[in-house]
């Protein structure tokens, strides 16, 4: 029997990697607060019982999850373009996964990404775990924001350090948005003012 997926065999994941939730009885104790995100902030509602106290599900949408550790990286002899890391696409954005992988294996390859400017997208990177070979000034749990048109790439010395490296041991999730992102007060409160200075050569 032949089972055909919507994805081709060279895709970095398959439908088997999509996980659906297991049913659990809803919490019956009330009241329950539900917070809804609105365009200008958050709105809080209070219910007498849990909103998931339902009998079934009808419709085309349902909850599911994809674990970043199930992403199978695409590698090449020379540095691959960002779309090889793409896992999802939606109107106005793409999501990419950077996971442990073999580095470029051409004898003269330079594994570090080249400096570039995203002329039509804002870039957010969430650093989950590992050693981020092209970055300094970040650690596990860091989030970087590079607005559209801002040149960025490896900091001084990171390109040279990458030469001869065999593999990447990192997990990071990137979101590129094709509409400008707006900074909130919360983001301003946790901004690391030293991060832009990490591109200055310390020598």
Predicted regions: what is each one?
Residues 1-3:
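Short, small-residue-biased leader/transition segments that mark boundaries at the very start
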Residues 6:
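Electropositive nucleic-acid-contacting surfaces
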Residues 10-13:
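Non-catalytic accessory regions outside enzyme or core folds
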Residues 15-106:
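A short, N-terminal "cap"/entry segment at the start of jelly-roll beta-barrel domains
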Residues 42-44, 122, 168-170:
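Sequence-level motif detector for i,i+2 pairs with an aromatic at +2
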Residues 89-101, 112-143, 147-149:
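Glycine- and acidic-residue-biased ligand/ion/polar-headgroup-sensing regions
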Residues 109:
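Short, flexible active-site loops
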Residues 135-203:
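TerminUS-proximal long segments
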């Amino acid at each position: 029997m032949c089972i055909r997926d919507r994805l081709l065999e060279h895709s970095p994941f398959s439908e088997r990697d999509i996980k659906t939730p297991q049913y659990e009885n809803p919490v019956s104790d009330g009241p329950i607060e539900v917070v809804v995100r609105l365009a200008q902030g958050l709105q809080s509602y209070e219910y007498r019982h849990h909103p998931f106290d339902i009998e079934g599900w009808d419709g085309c949408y349902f909850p599911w999850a994809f674990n970043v550790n199930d992403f199978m990286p695409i590698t090449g002899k020379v540095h691959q373009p960002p779309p090889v890391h793409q896992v999802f696409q939606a109107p106005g954005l793409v999501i990419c996964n950077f996971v442990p992988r073999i580095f470029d294996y051409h004898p003269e390859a330079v594994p570090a990404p080249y400096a570039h400017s995203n002329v039509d997208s804002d870039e957010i990177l969430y650093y989950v775990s590992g050693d981020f070979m092209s970055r300094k000034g970040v650690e596990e749990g860091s989030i970087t924001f590079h607005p559209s048109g801002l040149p960025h790439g490896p900091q001084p010395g990171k390109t040279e350090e990458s030469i001869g490296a065999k593999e990447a041991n990192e997990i990071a999730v990137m979101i590129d948005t094709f509409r400008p992102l707006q900074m909130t007060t919360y983001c301003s409160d946790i901004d690391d003012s030293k991060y832009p200075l990490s591109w200055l050569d310390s020598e």
